Amino acid sequence: MKQIITHVTHYRYTAPVTYSIQTLRLTPRDDEHQRVLRWHIEAPGALEQQVDAYGNITHTLTLNRPHTEIELRVVGQVLVDPLAQGALGGEDSRLPVHAYCVQTALTQADDTILAFARAVLPDGLNTPADVLTLATAIHDRVAYEPGTTDVTTAAGQVLALGHGVCQDHAHLFLACVRGLGVPARYVSGYLYTTNEHAASHAWADVWLAGTGWTSVDVTNRQFASDCHCRLAVGRDYDSASPVRGVRTGGGEESMEVSVQVQTALQQ
């Protein structure tokens, strides 16, 4: 599928910011499953490109002049191939696979999470069918309800609350999978969809012996497909988020995000 993507993020501040630095993970990688045809980031300053420890393309934006707003505008086209049961295979990674067994503050598996995972998969997680079984169980346990959590909500809180959004589904899934001793990683990206879910999306990859990385969209109870454009991977939201930054000054901050994903047929 050829995806045409427009992503605008606008930050506004109630007082001047004297210095800010942001890390942008807003550029998809070329790999055997997706090809970037055209991509451009428009920002109010020079961008310094790097590749981080997870293999993500990042840009650093530094502003050392007073400002009361920042607008980041991304436009591009990506050709995404279909995946057979979400299989990505053994793609190259800067980190060893077992590095993705490490839990984080957002994905820590407490006793309740471990009991939930073991009840769903008493024989462990070994096959693509197991991946989908766990995704479905989480989907059924945690209702999709925007505005009830934020990016600091940890997996244990998500399970207790019983509602959340895509990053919450992904964090709980990662907690369960790593709790079962299987490597898994967080994925941020875009989703072409006609339903109520936002086009900015999050899902997860699981490492299966003999298969490699298998990608699953927990929120939609399905394997990732050519509707999913990958931006970044990490251990959790914090290491794969589209934008992370710090600033001096600025007072209160507000943010508006607009994401549109179309197919070539819609143009």
Regions found by a protein language model. Give the residues of each.
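Ser/Thr-centric signal marking residues that sit
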Residues: T9, T149, T219
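Short, charged, solvent-exposed linker or helix-capping segments at domain edges/interfaces
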Residues: A84-E91, V216, V243
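Hydrophobic/aromatic-rich core segments of domains that either
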Residues: I21, D168-G251
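Generic structural "secondary-structure junction" signal
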Residues: Y19, L26, A43, N56, ...
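Short, surface-exposed linear segments at secondary-structure transitions and domain or protein termini
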Residues: L47-Q50, H98, F223-R230
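Intrinsically disordered, low-complexity N-terminal segments that are enriched in acidic
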Residues: M1-A84
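Residues in well-ordered beta-strands of folded domains
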Residues: R25-T27, E42-P44, V75, D205, ...
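Secondary-structure boundary elements
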Residues: V80-P82, S93-G164, L172, Y237, ...
